Amino acid sequence: MSKKCNIVSNVLSTLNHKIDKVFNERYKRNILNDDSYFTRIGKKTSFRDTMKTVISFGSDSLPLEMSRYFNDKDILPITKSGFIQSRSKIKPGAFIQVMDLINKAYPCKKNYKGYRLLAVDGSDLSIAKDKKDEGSRKFNGENTKSSYMLHINCEYDILNDRYIDCVVQKYNQQDENAALVAMSDRYKGDKAIFIADRYYAAYNNMAHLKEHGHKYLIRSKDINGATSILKNYFKGKEGEFDEDVSII
């Protein structure tokens, strides 16, 4: 138990250090909408607290999440509207940069025959209603209220249970193929095998992965499908093309 507590304490200490590093290097990292934000003496909520509160969010209301982070349900150092204002000062890229620094501080050690196994997939995330944000609005039918969503594309190290990269897109502007290309272009780690579902089976994706020296395993649509790329691979051939593979 003591060992686990020490590990958690060390990780939290590292997180604090990396968040502070990102803030101290804000002029070159481009993480704030204005570099003067969070510099006023006596400010109720620091850059670190704002970042850590957002990182710790679950699915509860904002007041409850704030209470949980500050460990006091009756007295908070900042109001709900004040926190929203503080959060809006930080660019999304700040969280990606903190994630990158944490991943570098704790290198992934597990691999499969020398390769990291990186799964790429996307998922929708519900967000608060904002009538001005047409890019995130999901139309649910004539007699149904619209919902507001973001599309989250993630790169996940399967063997090390670690998120490596992320691309956030507005619901109506989502492009999973572009997200895969962006994440594969940014990846600078050890040799890897990128694993993706059939919606990623596109020549452009494969070309980008190959250009960067990555291996890939991408599920494809059935050969008889109208948009299946397998038609070009097995054109003129007959019979079955299945091949037995070992499962990790």
Q: What are these language model-derived features?
A:
Residues 1-248:
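Conserved, well-structured functional cores that handle cations and Mg-NTP chemistry
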